[in-house]
């Protein structure tokens, strides 16, 4: 019995964030999305500043690849599709927030953190596109980070 209870519990801080956001979204609907996005964007700024302080100055490609790198070592491993000075594309086969099938809107709200982290590191604007997403029911996430021209 104990084993079944544990399997229903979040196993990481990211899973806890996902459960909290899904619950908040379920209760408050679309009104919750700007709040979720704002909180995750602000947290992304904090994390980006910490990474920049630790790692120093770097270009967009290096910052994006450095940020993505842990996902390349977790099972199932993410893949880099392309990495240039203005565009980094990846495929991920597992959602750290457990958003599978919960919709693109909540995914995009939570992923505001990721583009903010990279943007803060390089002091530039980043756009994240998600043409495929586990949250939308796709078999993988296809994330595209794009450095915007100023």
Regions found by a protein language model. Name each.
Residues 1-89, 93-110, 124-141, 146-150:
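N-terminal accessory segment detector
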Residues 110-120:
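A short, contiguous, amphipathic alpha-helix enriched in charged residues
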């Amino acid at each position: 019995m104990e084993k079944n209870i544990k399997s229903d519990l979040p196993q990481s801080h990211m899973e806890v964030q996902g459960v909290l956001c899904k619950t908040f979204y379920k209760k408050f609907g679309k009104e919750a999305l700007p709040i979720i996005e704002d909180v995750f964007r602000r947290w992304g700024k904090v994390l980006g500043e910490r990474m920049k302080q630790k790692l120093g100055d770097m270009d967009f490609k290096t910052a994006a690849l450095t940020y993505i790198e842990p996902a390349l070592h977790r099972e199932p491993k993410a893949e880099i599709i392309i990495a240039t000075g203005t565009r980094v594309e990846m495929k991920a086969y597992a959602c750290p927030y457990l958003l599978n099938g919960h919709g693109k809107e909540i995914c995009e709200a939570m992923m505001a953190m990721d583009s903010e982290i990279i943007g803060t590191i390089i002091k530039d604007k980043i756009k994240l596109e998600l043409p495929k997403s586990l949250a939308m029911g796709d078999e993988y996430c296809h994330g595209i980070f794009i450095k915007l021209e100023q």
